[in-house]
Amino acid sequence: MAEPIAITTDPSKTAEEIGEIIDKAEARWAARKSQYPEAPDAYEAMQTVLAWNTIYDPGNDRVISPVSRTWSVPSGGWVLFEWDTYFAAYMLSLDCKELAYANAIAITSEITDKGFVPNNSQPGIKSLDRSQPPVGAFVVKEIYKKYREKWFLDEVFEKLLRWNRWWADNREIDGYLSYGSDPYDYGDTYHRSFSGIGNLKGAKWESGLDNSPMYDDVVYDRMTHQMLLADVGLMSLYIIDCRSLSEIAAVLGKTEVEKELVQRAAKYSVMLETLWDAESGLYLNRDLLTGEFSHRLSPTLFYSLLAKVPDLKQAERMMKEHFYNPQEFWGEFIMPSVARYDPAFKDNMPSPQLPLKEDRR
């Protein structure tokens, strides 16, 4: 071929001009990658996946970054999972403010009439029975700390506050938080995710961990529509959510709401402390039917560190006796999604319901 060719959406550009645009983009990419000398390959992998998954949604005139194109194609063009999308926004905030804003606003705007951001949302369908772990306020706060634009906080605050209150009103048993799935009539239209409505499967899906061995033997209460399990991971993330929202409320001058959130964080911090097992040296999930601790260990038990609930001695025990324990979580590849000694560790199986979810280990 004698002359270079180029494919473009701007027919006014010549092949040479397009080549210059590409060269400049490659130079910018190399400069960004050089900012992470300790993990350039990780940065490149992350940005490559995010770029591939970022699409235009013409129905809503927005740019979004779904969890994968493989999920989006059979879902009507796009599908947003709650915490996946917030995490995408967080990662995108490294060097693309606009995409970080777009994704955080998009998933927050999918909030249901009941007041929670759903597990998943796609054209014409939302999971109206369940949410997913409350990570939105933390991500929004972190993005704000980088770019300091208050309009962004104003855009999402009231929705995030409704969602925060929803957890306390709808997922509390005896002062603890647990995952659930509320039954509802979805009519004549059927979708594969509807098989989890109002049952244990749906409650597991609300955790975002789907087939985690933590939940293998948990009882689902058909009266409360929740797992009978005081969940360390959920309570820790909720405490972080309360604190993050309280910081946002302070920035926005919402003093009374700030106090409400600080008090709520304190309340659940006290309850989380009752899940400390001195014998094990770790915060453990508690079976709310028997009152006994569960010894199915997973990384979510370390979320209590993020919530800053353990004191120094407790934190040291958690790290020395469990994180750095090669029989549990330490090793060449960390962290496995279940302790290495757990019988389920060898399964290495993706979720039978959601084949694209990560393996157990």
Regions found by a protein language model. Give the residues of each.
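Tryptophan-centric aromatic hotspots in well-structured domains and transmembrane helices
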Residues: 83, 121, 138, 163-171, ...
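Short, conserved secondary-structure transition motifs
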Residues: 125-131, 166-174
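Aromatic/His-enriched, Gly/Pro-containing loop or helix-boundary segments
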Residues: 114-156
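Aromatic- and histidine-enriched alpha-helix N-cap/loop-to-helix transition segments
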Residues: 76-86, 95, 127-135, 155-159, ...
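Extended, well-ordered alpha-helical scaffold segments
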Residues: 17, 21-24, 38-49, 96-107, ...
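Extended glycan-interaction surfaces of carbohydrate-active proteins
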Residues: 36-75, 103-123, 176-229, 267-359
